[in-house]
């Protein structure tokens, strides 16, 4: 059985991931907001040209701005989900890879794709539910996503215990270990 990685290294890997996610989100947000601002300005110009009396009233434009912000938020959420999907395909996030860690099954062998998908969905339940809430236009997913997300967040601190397993690892029978060749 391989040595399980404790809370400290896992937290360091997560910190690395967060830096990458912030950079990725910032780049995406910057391009998206620039594009949407150009679009919004074109709509305002068109509105002012078609009806000068409505030039000072941008109610429709404000609604468009809210829709644009929602789109940007969803784009960022999708980017984060995509970034962390490396855990499914590579058995580790970028932060874990940089620190020479991997996700394994409970006895230290390679984790199955099913276990990695389950772990991913549990770990990112809040973001997955936010996307579902947007797609079906109901707040129920958002509420339960927040609730389960909070439980999983608290469960991350289980990795500081003797078994070095977070709640999502316990539920999916996975552990985080040092790679053999690292």
Regions found by a protein language model. Give the residues of each.
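Hydrophobic, aromatic-rich alpha-helical transmembrane segments
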Residues: 3, 7-11, 15, 61, ...
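Membrane-helix interface segments in multi-pass membrane proteins
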Residues: 26-76, 131-152
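Alpha-helical transmembrane spans of integral membrane proteins, capturing the lipid-embedded, hydrophobic core
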Residues: 14, 18-22, 26, 72-80, ...
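FKBP-type peptidyl-prolyl cis-trans isomerase
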Residues: 101-103, 176
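Alpha-helical transmembrane segments of polytopic integral membrane proteins
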Residues: 21, 25-28, 78, 91, ...
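Cytosolic-side membrane-entry/anchor segment at the start of a transmembrane helix
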Residues: 1-40
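Short, acidic, Ser/Thr-enriched surface-loop or helix-capping motifs
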Residues: 105-107
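Juxtamembrane cytosolic face of transmembrane helices
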Residues: 2-12, 83-96, 110-113, 120-182
């Amino acid at each position: 059985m391989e040595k399980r990685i404790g809370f400290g290294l896992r937290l360091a890997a997560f910190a690395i991931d967060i830096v990458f996610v912030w950079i990725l989100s910032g780049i995406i947000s910057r391009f998206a907001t620039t594009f949407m601002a150009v679009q919004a300005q074109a709509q305002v110009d068109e509105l002012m040209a078609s009806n000068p009396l409505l030039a000072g009233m941008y109610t429709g434009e404000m609604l468009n701005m809210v829709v644009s912000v929602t789109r940007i938020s969803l784009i960022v959420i999708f980017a984060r989900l995509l970034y962390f999907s490396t855990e499914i395909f590579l058995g580790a996030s970028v932060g874990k890879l940089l620190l020479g860690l991997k996700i394994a099954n409970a006895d230290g062998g390679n984790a199955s794709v099913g276990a990695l998908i389950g772990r991913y969905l549990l770990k990112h339940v809040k973001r997955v539910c936010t996307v579902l809430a947007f797609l079906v236009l109901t707040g129920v997913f958002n509420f339960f996503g927040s609730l389960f997300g909070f439980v999983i967040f608290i469960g991350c601190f289980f990795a500081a215990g003797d078994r070095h397993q977070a709640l999502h690892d316990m539920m999916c029978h996975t552990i985080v270990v040092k790679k053999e060749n690292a």
